[in-house]
Amino acid sequence: VSHFPSCILFTVYNKDLEHKYHTISENHSFPAPLVDAIFSETHVLRIPNKFSLAPLGEHDYSSHFSINFGTDHSIATQDSELFTIVYEDTPAEYTHQLVNPHVTTDIDILYHFASQRGYANGLYFYHVENQVTIQAWKNGQFFLANRYAAENEDELFYYVMLVVDQLELPPADIHFSVIGTKQQHTSYHLLFNKYLSPLHLCNREQVEGTTDTTELAHFFGKCVL
């Protein structure tokens, strides 16, 4: 289950990780064909929620979130290897119909995906619902995870290059990657090809009839299965 602010994507895979069922709910209702279904694993992926990173092991994480987003939010936490992800825990009517769901965030999934690649300098990004999410690595160390409001390619370009400049990443020696559709990859490659290393597409296996939301749901879903 991929939980976006604007919609919920329900996707079913078989034991061989083949894509078997997919539907989109814009009113957060549970799909009728899945009501009586039994699954060996159930995952809920939160994409792209408001979030803050905080040190591990603290008793109260509310201040880390409120300093960026105010106090009028319900929050949840997820521990990663280096930090705790404090994210907005928006309610969803469908959750009571799931059995023992594993809840995780896109931030945690992308962190593990990138760390396993082992590139000394890396920048990974994706754009959905007028936000660009960026994670950056420098000299083999994790340096940044953030989201920026980006309604168009000019704003996306600005924030990607801002991260490169602020972290002093070497433009010609960076593993530069996007998660998205093939059309997005082509467009962003042209946007950045004079400034950064060639842009890689993380999710080369595309879903038929794809959109940015379905591609992100498919990519993150395959990462956790």
Q: Where in the sequence are the language-model features?
A:
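Hydrophobic/aromatic-enriched cytosolic interaction surfaces used to assemble or bind macromolecules
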Residues: 1-225
